[in-house]
Amino acid sequence: MSLSSSAPWLKYYGNVPHHLSYPQKTIYQMVKAAAERNPKLPAYEFMGKKTTFTQFMQKIDETAQAFLAMGIKKGDRVTICMPNCPQALHAFYGLNRIGAVSNMIHPLSAAGEIRFYLNFSHSKCILTLDQFYAK
């Protein structure tokens, strides 16, 4: 089967690659490699405060250890129902570090949607803010 018959839309894409190669690494391993190359560069900025890759990795590792202490292990699913904030990043990468699965849910989702995705994902626990607990 030719590329044009299996993916006919590609003829409209212009001069872009039709296939991308991805490294066989976890997202945590990729961030760790970036931190090793650029330890003093900002990994992110939140509300005017910059966090270096070194600081970011420290928070990720601390968060991963906290999950392990809670009994979260490789293969477990954990829902993160938080706004875009550093703690959500630390949780996402910390879970990836230990091999757990992050189930991201937008905190402004309707209560029924949150319930559906919690049940569907079989999450072992949920991380959220007190403002969203009532949902």
Place the predicted regions along the sequence by residue.
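Short, flexible active-site loop motifs that bind/organize anionic cofactors or intermediates
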Residues: 17, 46, 53, 104, ...
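Flexible, non-catalytic linker and terminal segments flanking ANL/adenylate-forming cores
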Residues: 1-24
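ANL superfamily adenylate-forming
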Residues: 10, 48, 134-135
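Short, solvent-exposed secondary-structure boundary motifs
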Residues: 22-25, 103-105
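Structural core segment of the AMP-binding/adenylate-forming
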Residues: 69-70, 97-135
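A short, compositionally biased
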Residues: 3-5, 35-40
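Conserved AMP-binding/adenylate-forming core of the ANL superfamily
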Residues: 21-23, 32, 40-85, 89-93, ...
